[in-house]
Amino acid sequence: MKKILLLGSGELGKEFVISAQRKGQHVIACDSYAGAPAMQVADEFEVFDMLDGEALERVVEKHHPDIIVPEIEAIRTERLYDFEKEGIQVVPSARAVNFTMNRKAIRDLAAKELGLKTANYFYAKTLDELKEAAAKIGFPCVVKPLMSSSGKGQSLVKSADELEHAWEYGCSGSRGDIRELIIEEFIKFDSEITLLTVTQKNGPTLFCPPIGHVQKGGDYRESFQPAHIDPAHLKEAEEMAEKVTRALTGAGLWGVEFFLSHENGVYFSELSPRPHDTGMVTLAGTQNLNEFELHLRAVLGLPIPGIKQERIGASAVILSPIASQERPQYRGMEEVTKEEDTYLRIFGKPFTRVNRRMGVVLCYAPLNSDLDALRDKAKRIAEKVEVY
């Protein structure tokens, strides 16, 4: 049995904890608020600000974990190097977590060091720098914080008149203490995919069937698997994913995102060194091993006999229309559970924000079924659930 310190306790962390406990592991779930989803199923929990390096060190000293598994971006990541030197396994590695928590580090690694094709981009520390960069890139363009999650602070800017708002919105959505934005050209893509990539301690890099997804405001709204893409584009995406994960080092599951264009090919977008929100579709049994089981096996060094597509799947998120500190209630579960070949996951978040992701509907069907119809089904069912 290993003692695992989970940094971040959202819905992805909750599913990881469930997988870990099924393999007899001991998990301490951490987050900045009590009652977070993963805490509800963990052996122990800690509530503290993970951007506070001293608080993080105190928790590590208290629990003496064998493994540290980051689940969110807002962590004092430079401390992870020290923990790794002390013999604690950081997943997938301290280098990987440190690079990917900051869009500047990962974009420069991908574009400048590894030569991956990306959108043209600049950085801006002031509004004036943002205006200068926009003049070079042109409109429309995309403005994002260097550190954020779930699309927070991200905007599509269509004219110079919108830059001041984009600057303020970007800074307000930034996680951590970094006040710098990335501005990038808007790629006219036909689709975007997540390629779940598994790096192992002993074994080859593995890839899950590609996951298509739809975002709104930079935040995941639906995903489906397998995404139907050009085999040549898939091969190119796999080569890019293997290149960047190898450079970052370590064992675990990664969510590597790409833009696909019939005209211009494959563009690397970004990656997360952990299970991905769009990968929740694998909870519909689309694969022989879902993304959380794959992550756990890679972390523990357990064999992965291969990844097989078992059936098609689609997910659609359930959002909160309200903001409240009261524990949320849900209507419509009876209607949802009448549906065949459908799972409902309510994450158990103790309070709401407007558009906060509170649950997900997962639908599945046999291979070679109509994927578009399945996507429509998942969205229709998700709309039946009301958060109040």
UniProtKB/Swiss-Prot annotation:
Residues 108-300 form the ATP-grasp domain. GO terms for biological process: 'de novo' IMP biosynthetic process. The keyword Ligase applies. ATP binds at R103, K144, S149, S150, G151, K152, G153, Q154, E184, E185, F186, I187, E192. It comes from the Bacteria. Coiled coil: none annotated. This is Formate-dependent phosphoribosylglycinamide formyltransferase.
